[in-house]
Amino acid sequence: MGRGRGFKLRAVSIAALAAGALAVAHTQTPAETAPAAATPPAQPAADVQHGKAVTYTCLGCHGIEGYKNAYPMYSVPELRGQNAEYLAIALHGYRDGDRAHITMHSQTETLSDQDMADAAAFLAGKPLVSSGKAAGTPPQAAQLCVSCHGPDGVAVAPIYPSLAGQHEDYIVRALDEYKHGGRKNLVMKQFASNLSDADIAAVAAYFSRLTPALETEPRPYTRLGE
């Protein structure tokens, strides 16, 4: 499939979006605010049924509860309840090289913008609804996270990922990639570079235990016609 022209993600700085943000800061205080995110380009209207067909192979990993893949081994992310707009942005990142992941690049390199919008809508399902309440006090390293990802881990805007109930080891891996350049996002690199391994572990542990939680996308069919 050819790439669509309506969504020129690479023309917009991923750093400005903070779209892949697992927004964390160690040296900043809770009173400080997160960097403002630019408004991303409009995405195509989604066709969920087409998204179901597009994601047929995706569920080979994302449809198995607790499944781990890639090297080093870590859990593939929970997608059910995630923001579809964020998922589409993430897919663009894998396709266009802003996220280094061989498997995900191979899965997305032939997808058009429309394909990714459709796939994201199907995989996300109904987004999580925020309770508006924090579960205890976030660790110091995560104080700034809640400004984008919510006090209960439910993102405050659809361009950000919700983190509530996400696999702990996946959050650790994502932060490590932002810190070391596996994900090209200058805003997140700035945040993650200030975190020690212990800080990253604390952030991941906190968000992974929050509810309402993301879930594994179910695999309701084995053939495209079902």
Task: State where each predicted segment sits.
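Interaction-mediating elements
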Residues: 101, 118-121, 185, 197-198, ...
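Extracytoplasmic c-type cytochrome modules immediately beyond a signal peptide or single-pass transmembrane anchor
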Residues: 23-26, 55, 68-76, 84-137
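N-terminal export/targeting leaders of redox proteins
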Residues: 1-45, 92, 96, 209-214, ...
